[in-house]
């Protein structure tokens, strides 16, 4: 459960990402594909080369979904319901991949926002991304 301090940390950090959210989303995806090659199976139709338009496009989708989640941090299940349905029923993404992408996103944010990425912010973002992952996998049952 996200505490009030966690919510403040998440919102504050996300506001600092600003216009870079799509860029950071794409970078996190690239990082995931490089470090966890098994995740590529869901993207066999993508050009997975560095800087590909498809990775940038999907990075933007990831970033937009997270921006929506931050904006609805008190009601993640409703905010992410359609996305949860998509990943569970149509795409059938292995739930572990959400954890892998979350890890890669944390690394990306730590690299780009080193002064802001304090231990408490790291913990808050980790809890937030775990909450998002839980919602996205809730309809797998």
From Swiss-Prot:
Annotated binding of heme b, by residue: 87
Residues with PTM N6-acetyllysine: 16
GO process annotations (BP): hydrogen peroxide catabolic process
Tissue: Red blood cells.
Residues bearing the modification Phosphotyrosine: 24
PROSITE patterns (UniProt xref): GLOBIN
Residues annotated as domain Globin: 1-141
SUPFAM superfamilies in UniProt: Globin-like
Assigned GO CC terms: blood microparticle; haptoglobin-hemoglobin complex; hemoglobin complex
Molecular function GO labels: haptoglobin binding; heme binding; iron ion binding; organic acid binding; oxygen binding; oxygen carrier activity; peroxidase activity
Record: residues binding O2: 58
Modified residues annotated as N6-succinyllysine in this record: 7, 11, 16, 40
Pfam families named among the record's database cross-references: Globin
Keywords for this protein: Acetylation, Heme, Iron, Metal-binding, Oxygen transport, Phosphoprotein, Transport
Annotated function: Involved in oxygen transport from the lung to the various peripheral tissues.
Family classification: Belongs to the globin family.
UniProt subunit comment: Heterotetramer of two alpha chains and two beta chains.
Listed name of the protein: Hemoglobin subunit alpha
